[in-house]
Amino acid sequence: MENKFNHFDNEGNAIMVDVGNKNATERIAIASGKIRVNRDTFLAIEQGTAKKGDVLGVARVAGIMAAKKTSELIPLCHPLMITNCTIDFELLPKTLEVEVTSKVKVTGNTGVEMEALTAVSTTLLTIYDMCKAIDKAMEISNIHLRRKIGGKSGDFINE
């Protein structure tokens, strides 16, 4: 089986893949990533005392908005009618990390992997933005696709 990039034509020009002949099916993508912060920042996030307000609440909304805007950020992504997007947080006190997980659903003819990854990335960047006044050394890491369900290429699990 030959692997080839499908966003290029035979001359190497960037193209948007034609998904018009694909069946509309339910597709789900789950992505996650982490941000490591210092102890003061972790406590401010956990206790909701950051100067800019509810860090996780604002970050959640930013992530959902980003999922909806992915095609405006990633040049060859199709605009999608997302049917659901959730952003969840796990506070990890031992490592002073916040883990973000996004789950995006669509009933359509192309997947939502980029939407899930964009949601996680933007959520993490929003946490950074809201906390940078007290912690400029925060580190964002391990952004990755954990699971893809549905579509022509089948399911993918990376957990």
Curated annotation (Swiss-Prot):
One of its GO terms (biological process) is Mo-molybdopterin cofactor biosynthetic process. Keywords: Lyase, Molybdenum cofactor biosynthesis. It catalyses: (8S)-3',8-cyclo-7,8-dihydroguanosine 5'-triphosphate = cyclic pyranopterin phosphate + diphosphate. It comes from Clostridium botulinum (strain Eklund 17B / Type B). One of its GO terms (molecular function) is cyclic pyranopterin monophosphate synthase activity. Coiled coil: none annotated. Pfam families: MoaC. Pathway: Cofactor biosynthesis; molybdopterin biosynthesis. Substrate binds at residues 76-78, 114-115. The active site is at 129. Belongs to the MoaC family. Its EC number is 4.6.1.17. It is an enzyme of class 4 (lyase). Homohexamer; trimer of dimers. It comes from the Bacteria. This is Cyclic pyranopterin monophosphate synthase. SUPFAM superfamilies: Molybdenum cofactor biosynthesis protein C, MoaC. InterPro entries: MoaC, MoaC_bact/euk, MoaC_sf, MoCo_biosynth_MoaA/MoaC, Mopterin_CF_biosynth-C_dom. NCBIfam families: moaC, PRK09364.1. Catalyzes the conversion of (8S)-3',8-cyclo-7,8-dihydroguanosine 5'-triphosphate to cyclic pyranopterin monophosphate (cPMP).
